[in-house]
Amino acid sequence: MTGDDLEGLTFAAEPDEALSGWTVVVSAGREGDAYAGALDVTASATPSETAVTLTVTDRNGKPWSATTPTLTAVQAPVTAIDLSRDGTANCYIVSEAGDYMFDAAVRGNGSGDDAAIALADGMKADWLWVTKGLEQEISAVSLDAGKGRIFFTAAGAAKGNAVIALADAAGEIVWSWHLWFTPEPRRVTYANGRVLLDRSLGAVGTTPGSAEAYGLYYQWGRKDPFCGGTAPETSATAFAQAAKNSVVNPAFADTHAWKQESGAAVSTLEYAAAHPLSFLSNKGATGVYDWLAKPRADLWNTAKTCYDPCPVGYKVPDRDTWDDFADDQDRYVDGTSEWDGEKYGMTYIFGDLRDWYPTSGYRNRDKGNLAGLATTRTGHYWSNYRSGNTISCFYISKKLSTGKLLQPQSSSKSDAAYGYNVRCCRE
């Protein structure tokens, strides 16, 4: 290209479609009256082919060339870490900054006849809620339906939790995934051969006495995590701490909030998937509380299901996982237990291993309020076992007024509507 006025040139790239993050890089040099150079145009949006019109103007604002070449710019693909490369799940661990993606066309681990998600025009993805303070931790959430992937960027500066939701064209949530922003959990091998993560699902630390070790709460058979707190709640104040400790995306805030709902109309799998922030409760004829009007015993199982909340390679534990936590309050078959009255919890000891189980309470089966955090400290950890209305969990309790440690129970019975912690076990 040559011209009479070659200094102070301005290059503008205008894509035919609206793409954010375009940059123009110019490298050039003068040779006599000629001005030679190269123009690189790079877009940072989802990879696509886009027609680009290049306009060159001189320092007086006049077109430098009467012709405007039309180029086809092929955006270089963003290198994103595929969290689902080793398998899919309802939870993915994020331990460092970077660009990420995961399979959006599969529910959970893909098991079962209803695990596939049909991605359609008009669908979109965005974060639903995040731990308060993590609003800037997750960004650039988008769905690439053609690739069947959801993309996002993690800043890597904070610890906590987030949920990404996939919504249809009408804004209804189709499915959602939990992002667990935590240092990579340590794997703890018990004497019975079971390998468990060293923290509750959703916990961002393991220090005894720290609320970072509390983790999230789950109703039996649901994949959806519920935020907790450090103090008991009444029925009237249920989810006050969840609302305080998290932020709901304004894009969803008109239709989604932490709350309790009951009744047959909302007690279905479909409603639960579409309302991840709703704590569901349905009282059966026998007085047993379930979040389903028609209870199912196969939502969690010995073989991991598409409703299991654990990360890739892990599942909700079998009920015999804690059998070695025997009747003896002080010493177990494969190790010892130490109750910490100031930090409220038990440390499982086996050789050089230490595994902290906090008494982080639970969410009540009817109104969803936090309990077990006052005069009696309790810890509840779900197993995957259910037979009829009998559901097993690992249970710890300490009556603070007397200092009496109530016997740890490796297979305590409970209702599915309760919100308990989960300690994930390797498949």
Task: Walk through the language-model features, giving the residues of each.
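A short beta-strand micro-motif common to beta-rich folds, especially ectodomain repeats
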Residues: 39, 47-59, 158-169
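Terminal edge beta-strands and adjacent linker/stalk segments
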Residues: 67-73
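Short, compositionally biased
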Residues: 76-304, 387, 416-427
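Extracellular acidic loop/turn motifs
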Residues: 2-9, 19
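Extracellular/luminal low-complexity segments enriched in Ser/Thr/Pro
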Residues: 30, 34-47, 145-159
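Short, exposed coil/turn segments at beta-strand boundaries within extracellular/luminal domains
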Residues: 59-67, 170-175
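C-terminal, surface-exposed recognition/capping segments
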Residues: 163, 203, 277, 282-427
